[in-house]
Amino acid sequence: MSKLDLNALNELPKVDRILALAETNAQLEKLDAEGRVAWALDNLPGEYVLSSSFGIQAAVSLHLVNQIRPDIPVILTDTGYLFPETYRFIDELTDKLKLNLKVYRATESAAWQEARYGKLWEQGVEGIEKYNDINKVEPMNRALKELNAQTWFAGLRREQSGSRANLPVLAIQRGVFKVLPIIDWDNRTIYQYLQKHGLKYHPLWDEGYLSVGDTHTTRKWEPGMAEEETRFFGLKRECGLHEG
């Protein structure tokens, strides 16, 4: 696998970009997660960043990437509505793993947004999408720009939802390379990695949460529910960061 030209690929239509990366992705599927990270650092342009929501299994990708690339900027988009347990988990992992945490937030405070728009998350799919654009997408775009990112690592997995089932290891999103080192991991592999490295699930895992985001759009799992139904009232799975 040879080095890839981000500028040249960005000039191609989306379908052509996918085709251009197909051979590389076929080879990346054969590598383990650590090998994928190492390949990306050797063959894709910097600067490099890692995003995390500090969700249920966040410790895995944070540990895996950070041990290979210490001090990599870790981007968190903070909505102001995370669970108290999440904020404590962020502090715990930042200290334990010595993370180079970069927190980005909307330009409008949560209170100001509610005054202007009401509770957007109660306004159907359109309201949720506007909320996500303000609190997730715009801050992430700003983070990528300010950090001069050209390669973005994330911890998505195909097993998590139907919308992620066909994602490749390597793609281009928001004009940068996006690498998903643990895309093909199952829950058992996640558990084994956490055990091997003395890491923990998010504290709400023990209370029945399979996925954790904002307090107002996250539900505990109940028998018969798919994992994606625990977020955004089952109306959508993605918060916007990993779409497009």
From Swiss-Prot:
Pathway: Sulfur metabolism; hydrogen sulfide biosynthesis; sulfite from sulfate: step 3/3. It is an enzyme of class 1 (oxidoreductase). Its EC number is 1.8.4.8. The active site is at C239 (nucleophile). GO terms for molecular function: phosphoadenylyl-sulfate reductase (thioredoxin) activity. It catalyses: [thioredoxin]-disulfide + sulfite + adenosine 3',5'-bisphosphate + 2 H(+) = [thioredoxin]-dithiol + 3'-phosphoadenylyl sulfate. InterPro entries: PAPS/APS_Rdtase (IPR004511), PAPS_reduct_dom (IPR002500), PAPS_reductase_CysH (IPR011800), Rossmann-like_a/b/a_fold (IPR014729). Keywords: Cytoplasm, Oxidoreductase. One of its GO terms (cellular component) is cytoplasm. It is found in: Cytoplasm. Its main location: cytoplasm. Coiled coil: none annotated. Belongs to the PAPS reductase family. CysH subfamily. This is Phosphoadenosine 5'-phosphosulfate reductase.
